[in-house]
Regions:
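Short glycine- and Lys/Arg-enriched binding-loop motifs that mark or flank ligand-binding interfaces
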Residues: 111, 115, 269, 291-293
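C-terminal accessory segments of proteins
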Residues: 258-276
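Short amphipathic alpha-helical surface patches that serve as generic macromolecular interface elements
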Residues: 262-265, 285, 302, 321
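Active-site-proximal inter-transmembrane loops
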Residues: 203-210, 272-298, 304-305
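Short Pro-Cys-Gly-centered "Cys-loop" motif that presents a nucleophilic cysteine in a tight turn
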Residues: 3-7, 269-272, 294
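Catalytic glutamate of the conserved HExxH
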Residues: 109, 122, 267, 271, ...
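Non-catalytic, topology-defining segments of multipass membrane proteins
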Residues: 1-263, 308-357
Length: 357
């Protein structure tokens, strides 16, 4: 679910973000097959919320098999980014404060739950609901400060994962190794040509979204601003030790937690757990990942019905992300919510000029 090039935004400046998508790049159908007759619903929202990608498309895309040739060239920006965050998190025991822990947990929900699970995944990748432009920008921003790459990177990789789930072409299948699926797939280097073809094919809607492109190009800026705010606030209102504590716990520790919980959806939820639906991939429902990842761990349910806003399909499969979507819908900030396995079951709220802004 995470981008392999989250910190290399400069490599995309010549990647053709203004390029459009041809009708030949889309078709109906595709994706993960299920035993139930849900093709019209369950197999949508891979290429964009209204269609799928073809088996053809650009000839050059990032390679994703776990092979020795990959390790000839590493994507050093990603290695340094992820490695540096983990090293910084090792300082956490020496700068522990209860307020730092509280900030860590709060930002874990804000960036991981609202940003990644709700924003990147259910809204931008699958179109499980619609919202206003300001809210869409906000969720994309929160997803970005999770540290998992820009929305363009993240969504492109995840849509490709659904199109080739646990088959040749899946960026992170455990069939290539558990650690590969968990995090090693992020590090091999890709050329600008490969990256441009990849994003054009799998995220053509987002590369034409000015707000999302802006967040992509300013990915690192938001982390610098957040880190400065945490350090400055703790230092100003308390002391230097508290400022450093807030920085380490609110940025580094929180990012490591969000990283690995997201990665567990890619790895553990394709290896262990139970299945409610007979799909053509290895997706599983894993209760503890479901709890840690705000409902994302009910992964077999999701692969069976990809656009469905609710990932928990049984009463005891808790899905906090869906609860937030329901809350947004109740106040008119979400509509066209895909509530059921057969599509949108409720009429959208009356639209006004304000919530269309």
């Amino acid at each position: 679910m995470m981008s392999p090039h989250s910190t290399a935004s400069d490599r995309y400046r010549d990647a053709g973000f203004d390029a459009g998508v041809n009708a030949s790049d889309q078709r109906d159908g595709g994706g993960t097959a299920v035993a139930e007759p849900c093709d019209a619903f369950g197999r949508s929202a891979i290429h964009d919320p209204r269609g799928d990608a073809t088996a053809g498309g650009p000839a050059v895309e990032p390679r994703n098999e776990n092979g020795a040739a990959h390790w000839a060239d590493l994507d050093w920006p990603s290695v340094i980014w992820i490695g540096g965050v983990h090293l910084a998190a090792l300082l956490a025991p020496f700068y522990f404060t209860w307020s730092g822990l509280a900030i860590c947990l709060a930002l874990y929900w804000v960036t991981g739950g609202l940003g990644v699970c709700l924003g990147y995944h259910r809204l931008l990748t699958h179109g499980s609901f619609q919202t206003t432009k300001p809210m869409r920008f906000l969720f994309a921003l929160l997803g970005g400060v999770s540290g998992e790459g820009s929305a363009i990177d993240w969504v492109a990789n995840h849509r490709k994962h659904h199109a080739f789930s646990d088959q040749d072409g899946d960026p992170h299948t455990p069939r290539d190794g558990g650690w590969w699926a968990h995090m090693l797939w992020i590090f091999p280097q890709h050329t600008r040509e490969e990256l441009a073809a990849h994003t054009k094919r799998w995220a053509p809607d987002l590369v034409k979204d000015k707000g999302v492109v802006f967040l992509h190009k300013t990915f690192l800026v938001w982390h610098i601003l957040l880190g400065s705010a945490l350090l400055g606030a703790g230092w100003t209102f308390f002391d230097r030790f508290t400022g450093v504590s807030w920085l380490i716990w609110g940025l580094a520790v929180r990012m490591v937690i969000v990283f690995h919980i997201t990665w567990l959806v890619n790895s553990a939820s394709h290896m262990w757990g139970y299945r409610n639906y007979e799909t053509t991939d290895d997706s599983r429902n894993l209760w503890w990942v479901g709890l840690l990842a705000f409902g994302e761990g009910w992964h077999n349910n999701h692969h069976a019905y990809q656009r469905m806003a609710a990932h928990g399909h049984r009463w005891w499969e808790l899905d906090p992300t869906y609860w937030v979507i329901r809350g947004l819908e109740s106040v008119g900030l979400a509509w066209d919510v895909v509530h059921t396995r057969h599509g949108i079951s409720r009429k959208p709220p009356l639209q006004t000029a304000a919530n269309r802004a």
